[in-house]
Amino acid sequence: MKAIRMRALVRGFTVIGACSTALAPSGCGLFGPSAEHFLIPVDSIAVPSIVAATDTLTARFYGGIGPDGCWRLARVDKQVTSASLDVTFHGEHQVRSGYACTASPVALNYAEVLKPPLGTPFAITVHQPDGSLLRRLATVQ
């Protein structure tokens, strides 16, 4: 009886080991694809230098997210006041088993529209992955 229990236990460990070995190289966890999270670097902010006090202000953000279609913009953290916009872009790299990524690089092309009233100067700040800040100012007249 003890021998039968021992064989069943060994077979159970063998099945568990085989399943986890099969999942490891595929890049998948037990509950689906794994994802790597990162901050997206912003190359430039396009914003008019002067804005009328009654106009909306459109700030455009450009940069590179990743080398292929498995990279994406996951979320945008922003804090808006009457005098500033503070932004951090978060990306995600998805690793999926048996999934081919498109070969095209993924670019950041994001616009934020801000409605009046706006303070002057209006400061737009982006938090970069290396800890630095990218900042642009717009004069509101």
What are these regions (language model features)?
Residues 19-44:
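Bacterial Sec-dependent N-terminal signal peptides
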Residues 42, 47-79:
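Short, surface-exposed binding/anchoring microloops in extracellular/periplasmic proteins
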Residues 61, 83-92:
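Short, aliphatic-rich beta-strand segments
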Residues 65, 77, 89-93, 118, ...:
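A mature extracytoplasmic/lumenal domain signature
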Residues 89-116:
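An anionic, turn-rich surface loop/hairpin at beta-sheet edges
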Residues 139-141:
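Short beta-strand edge segments in extracellular beta-sheet folds
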